[in-house]
C-alpha cells in the first residue's frame, strides 16, 4: 500500500499524533470513549462528527460525559439523556452565554442556570494539589474530523475541530503541498466557503481558526468573509518567515505536538487568549476584539517564565522584537504571569515594575489583569518617591511608572526594599512621546532638533542603570526593536567568541521576519529622497515620450525656514496625498499622513501652511499639530491644544476620525505610536541611526486593507537610511534610486520577444477599462500565451517572465511618484498584470494563487483606473471660476517685499555662480519685468481674462523675453533653459512683480 499524500492523509496523520490512535475510526455515535492517561501526545479523544448538535454548536456526548464525571447531579437536573424542553433550555442558556461572553470566559468561569452553578472546565492544577490534578484530568479534549457544522449547507465540513468538554474552541482547514495546495488556499477557503453568519463562526465562539499546510500556519480570531485577517503562527527560519526543516516530521507539527496539547491549550486559555472591549468616547459604542497570541509572543513569554523561574531574581534579559510585533501584549502577558511565578515553591518576585510612557501599554496591562483579578487591587501607578512602599503595603503586585519617575523607584528598591524581589519590565525603545510625556524633555529634544546624539528613552534608562548599578534583588526584562550597544551590554546575554565576550538578545523576532510574514510593511520599498525625486523629473526633458504637462508640475526642494519654502513643500505634500494616496483609495480610503518636522517652530509653520492650502483646494480634510509645551509663535503663546481646538490627550483618537488626515509632529508620536491607518510620511528633518528606524517604522503597522506605504524625504538620502536600518535588519533590501529609463529598457526587451503586439495591448486595455466581461479578455491573453510557448525557448521564457514582473514592480513604484505620465507604460502595466499569471511557470512553481488573484481584481482595477486618470484632475484643477474679487487663490507678493523674494532666491540658488551677480539681479528686478509687462498678449489677458489665463500668457511672454536675451546674456538664458527649478522660480517672481501693475 502506497503512502497517502492526500489532504485526508494529512488530516489522519494529525489526528493520529493527537490521539495516539493510528488512523483510527471514530467511536460509534453516542459512545464516549474514556479519556486516556495524558502521556506524551496521546491525550486527545477522537470525537464523532455525528455527536455534534448544529443548532447549539456543542458535542453533546462529550459534554454529557464531562458533566457525568464531575457534576453528576446535573445530568438529571438538565435531563441531558433526553431531547426534552429541559435540555433545550440548558443548551440555549449555554449558547447564549457563549454568544454574549465568549468561549474563553465561559470556560474560565462557567455559567449559572437556574439554581445551578455549572463548571465547564478545570484549569491548570497548582503543583502538589492532588485534587486539582484529578479534576484537570477529567477534562475532555476531543478532536473531530470532517465536522459538518451547518444546518443549511449540510454538506459543508471542516477538516478538523477541537473541543473542550464538548464546546468548540478551534477549527482547522488543512492543505497539502504535495497536492499543489498551500496555506493560502486554506485561507481562501475560510474566506470564501465559511459563512461568518454560521453560529460556529460567530465572534467569540472559537478562540482561533487555523489555516495549516505542511510548511506554514496562519490563524484568524474572527471570520468576516473576505475581510478575514489571518496572522502568521510560524516559528521563523533564518531570521525570516516560515519554519525550519523538521528531521522528525512535518515542519508544522509543532502546532499540534507542542502548542495545542491539553496543557498548552489550557495555558493559552488561562493566560493569553482574551476578549477586550474598547469604548468610543464620542459615540459610546463598544467594540470587541478577541486576542490570541502569535507564536513569537507565546514563545518569548514562556521562555522568560521558564528561565526566571529557574534562576529567580537578579538576571537580565534583552528581548529584541520588531516594531509592530505586539510587544505591548507580550509585556502585559509577562507582567501578569510573573505575579504567580514560583521558585523553590516561593514567589520568584514580590512585585512587578513596568516602565513605560505609552498609554496603550498601560491599558493593555489593565485589560489583561481584568480577565483574572480586580485591576484596582492589583495595579498601581508610581509617580513619587514613597509610592512603591505604599503600593506594596496595599498589596498591589504590578506597579507602572514612567522613565522620568524610574529613578525614584530604583532608589526605593535599592534602599528600603532590598530584601524584596522585583521584576522590572522596561519598554525602553519608546521615547516619551504621545502618552504621559515629560514636556520638559520633549521641549529640550525639540530645541536640539533630533540629532543622532539625541538622548532617547533607551539612553536615559541606560544612564540610570549605569548610575545605580544593576540591583541584585531585581531581574530586568528590556524590550526593544532597536538595541544600542549599551543596551546589549547591559541586558544582553554574554557569550564567548574567540577571545571576545559578546552579547546577544535572549529572544528575537526580527524586522525581516515580521516583513516576510506580512505582519508589518516594508517602509524601505517606497522610500524616496527628494533628491532622487528631482533626478527623476530632470531626466524627462530629453525624453519625448513623456507627458510634458505632468513634467511641468511643480516640485522643488525647499529646506529653508522661510514661509515661502514651507508653503511650497506643504503644497507638494497636500497635492501628493490627494492625488497619489486618497485618489488611489489607499487603505480603503482611510489613509492618514504624518509630517515629521525638525522642531516646534517648523511644525507650527507647516500646520498653518497645510491648513491654508487645504482650504484653497476646497479639500474636506484638516490637519492636527503635535508638540509638547507652550511656544511663542508670532508674538503669541500657543500650545497644540490651542491650535487644534481640542485637548492634547485626544490627538490619537482624533487623527483616525474624519476630517483629520495630516498629523504634523515635532518630536512627538515618532516612536511608540501604533496607528495602522498611517500610510504616507513626509520627512523634513535630519534622521540617522535608531531615530531613523523608529521614525519610519511608524508606517509599518499592518491593516487588512493596507498593501503599501510611501515615504517622501526632503532632508535625508538613501545611504543614511540604509546605514540606519542595517544593524536591525539582516538583509538590506533598499536599493538606490530607480532610474525611469529602466522602464524604457525593460519595455524594449519585452517588445523584442514579440509575445504580444501593440494592437493586443490596446484592445485588452480598452476592454478592461470599459468594464467588459472577463471572458472577452481571455482570447487575447491566450493568444499571447500560445506565442510565448511556441516561439520562445525555456531560457527566453524565463527571461521574458522575469522582465515582465520587473516592469510591473518598477512601474508600480515609479508610477506613484513621477509627476508625469506615460500612457504606453500604463497600458503595458495593465496588460502584463493579466498576462503574467497566465504564463506557464517553472515546474516547481505553483501559480494557482496567481490565477486567483488575476480573477479577483476589483481593488487593483480601481487603483489602476485612478492612476490612469490622475492626469485629468490636473487639467481640471487648472480651471477655476472667474473670481468675483478679480484676484486669484492667494495674494501675490507686493513689490515692497522684493527683498524677501530675492533673499529666498539667493538662499535657494546660491550654488549658481553668476559672473556678474549685480547685473543679473538688475535684469530680474528691472529689465525682464518691464519687457514682460509690455507684452500685448499679456496685457490683454490681465484686462479681459482671469488670473489663470493671465499666468499662461505671462509664461509665454517671459519665454519670448528670455529667448531675446540669448545673444546678449547667454548665462541667464542657459540657467533658464537647463535648470527647471530656476525657470519656475523666475516665472513665479516675475509674475508676482507684474500682475498687479497697471497695464500701459
Segments and roles (model prediction):
Residues 556-663:
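Conserved C-terminal RecA-like helicase domain
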Residues 698-727:
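Conserved segment of the helicase C-terminal RecA-like domain
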Residues 25-27, 37, 54-59, 63-76, ...:
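Catalytic cores and motor modules of nucleic-acid processing enzymes
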Residues 396-428, 432-443, 457-466, 644-652, ...:
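Conserved RecA-like ASCE ATPase "motif II neighborhood" in helicase/translocase motors
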Residues 434-523:
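Post-DEXD/H (motif II) to motif III coupling segment of the RecA-like Helicase ATP-binding lobe
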Residues 370-411:
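Inter-Walker segment of RecA-like/P-loop motor cores
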Residues 246-255, 486-590, 607, 611:
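Interdomain helical connector at the RecA1-RecA2 junction of SF1/SF2 helicase-like NTPases
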Residues 2-351, 360, 364-375, 404, ...:
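ATP-dependent helicase/translocase motor core
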